[in-house]
From Swiss-Prot:
InterPro entries: P-loop_NTPase, Thymidine_kinase, Thymidine_kinase_CS
Presence of keyword DNA repair: no
Main localization of the protein described in the UniProt heading: cytoplasm
Residue sites binding ATP per the record: G15, S16, M17, F18, S19, G20, K21, T22, D121, E122, A123, N124
First-level EC class: transferase
EC number, UniProt record: 2.7.1.21
Entry keywords, A to Z: ATP-binding, Cytoplasm, DNA synthesis, Kinase, Metal-binding, Nucleotide-binding, Transferase, Zinc
Species assigned in the record: Haloquadratum walsbyi (strain DSM 16790 / HBSQ001)
Segments of skewed composition (Polar residues): 90-104
Residues covered by region (Disordered): 85-110
List of residues binding Zn(2+): C178, C181, C216, C219
UniProt protein name: Thymidine kinase
Family the UniProt entry places it in: Belongs to the thymidine kinase family.
GO biological process, one term: DNA biosynthetic process
Length: 225
C-alpha cells in the first residue's frame, strides 16, 4: 500500500517486455476504481497494438485511454485534457431561498477536480518532456502512475524512464522469465526474421511477441556484423 498523503506523487512500473508492467498498471487502476477514485489514462500516439484508444496487456486486459502526441510540447496535451475534464465535471449548486444560507438564491461552485489518478502507459515512447509533465501533475496533487520499459533492445537506458525513476516517489522494477534458459529476464531481445537484431537498427519498433522476447543478460544477443 502507498502512504496516504495530501499531495500528489509519481509511481513508476518498469522492467523488460512481458514482465507484466501494463498488467500491474491496470491492477492499480482497478483498485483505484473500486475505491471510487476517478481515473484518466493516456497513451502515446505511436502505440496502436491493442487499438488506437486502448491500453492493453499481453494477457488481454484492456482500459480505454486518450491518445496524446509523444513528441515536444504536444505532450502537455495531457494536462490540457485534464483541464477539460475538470471544467466539464465542475458542478454548481443552486441554493434555495430561505434555506438558512448567507447567499439565498446564489450559485456555489463545487471544487471537484474530477480526476484523482493519472495513468500513462508505454512511457518509453514519449520524449523526455514527459518528465516535466509528470512532475507538474504530481505538484498539482495528482497520483501519477507511469509504466514503460527502461531499456532499449540494446540493453541501454531508454529515456525518459530513467529520468522518471529518478524523480518518482515509488519505483517497481519487474522481471520476466528468459525464453531461452528460464532465468529472471531483464532485457528486451528484438528479433528480425527470427534472428537477433543488429546493433545499428532503429531503437523504436512497436511490436508484440512476434518481434520481441524477454531474455536474461547471458542470453541477450546483438548482431554486430
Amino acid at each position: 500500500m502507498r502512504a496516504i498523503t495530501n499531495s500528489g506523487w509519481i509511481e513508476v512500473v518498469t522492467g523488460s517486455m512481458f514482465s507484466g508492467k501494463t498488467e500491474e498498471l491496470l491492477r492499480r487502476l482497478r483498485r483505484a476504481e473500486i475505491a471510487g477514485q476517478s481515473i484518466a489514462v493516456f497513451k502515446p500516439a505511436v502505440d496502436d497494438r491493442y487499438g488506437e484508444t486502448t491500453v492493453g496487456s499481453h494477457v488481454g486486459r484492456q482500459w480505454e485511454a486518450a491518445v496524446v502526441p509523444n513528441e515536444g510540447e504536444d505532450i502537455w496535451n495531457i494536462k490540457h485534457e485534464l483541464s477539460k475534464k475538470k471544467q466539464n465535471h465542475r458542478t454548481t449548486t443552486q441554493c434555495r431561498s430561505g434555506d438558512g444560507t448567507n447567499n439565498p438564491g446564489g450559485v456555489i461552485p463545487s471544487n471537484d477536480d474530477s480526476v484523482d489518478v493519472v495513468a500513462i502507459d508505454e512511457a518509453n515512447f514519449f520524449s523526455t518532456e514527459l518528465v516535466s509533465v509528470c512532475e507538474s501533475l504530481a505538484n498539482d496533487g495528482y497520483r501519477v502512475v507511469v509504466s514503460g520499459t527502461d531499456q532499449t533492445y540494446r540493453g541501454e537506458p531508454f529515456e525518459p524512464l530513467p529520468q522518471l525513476m529518478a524523480v518518482a516517489e515509488y519505483v517497481d522494477k519487474l522481471q520476466a522469465i528468459c525464453t531461452q534458459c528460464g532465468e529472471p529476464a531483464t532485457r528486451n531481445q528484438r528479433l528480425v526474421d527470427d534472428s537477433p537484431a543488429h546493433i545499428d537498427d532503429p531503437t523504436i519498433v512497436v511490436g508484440a511477441d512476434e518481434t520481441y522476447e524477454a531474455r536474461c543478460r547471458n542470453c541477450h544477443i546483438l548482431r554486430h556484423e
